[in-house]
């Protein structure tokens, strides 16, 4: 019987300063899990910097690395969907490129899914240390509102950093929403989820790509798509 495959999806937008760092951190972690095979799927979301060249170099150097590149910036949700659609793994995990999602959690996530008690291992921040106060306040207000008006299990402080079984990934892909809001979809499909908590980790390099207006549009997508209240 062959090794189980872990697919690691990493959306990237102008992350030339971080993609090599996250690659090294992931490979170091996976070297400690020789019983599993893995693929790293970078999705270049129309970056305007040197991200694509960095990804090309990594893929030429390491057969574990693949990349997909958009012609323009379609947004993180589109990149996540493209990654899920191309992932072949028995287990699939989504991570940010900026090292705010610690690869050191991967062994615990795999072990949890291997137990058979859960179909998903999700993560949430228990603090927003280092984040602008206005952004933290708006985020807390959004989560309070969405929990009041939606049946989807959307947890305050939830990250996109999540590992899922193949069955759950297939269920997520089966949903045909045009404007996708992954945090809501992951809760909506109803699989058993274990939550891991950790302190906020500031990005290692580069700048956040989430302006106030992008965050507002993202929040409105979540409210419109998952509200039980007539809008």
Model features per residue range: what roles?
Residues 74-77, 226-231:
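Loop-to-transmembrane-helix entry motif
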Residues 34, 116-117, 150, 227-230:
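Residues at helix C-cap/C′ positions in short coil/turn segments immediately following an alpha-helix
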Residues 14, 18, 35, 174-178, ...:
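Alpha-helical structural elements of signaling/regulatory helical domains
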Residues 188:
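Flexible glycine/serine/alanine-rich "lid" or loop that lines and gates the nucleotide-sugar donor pocket
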Residues 57, 68-72, 76-86, 91, ...:
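Acceptor/aglycone-binding surface of glycosyltransferases and processive sugar-polymer synthases
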Residues 1-131:
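Structured catalytic core of nucleotide-sugar glycosyltransferases
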Residues 179-180, 192-197, 230-231:
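Short, structured loop/turn "capping" segments at alpha-beta junctions
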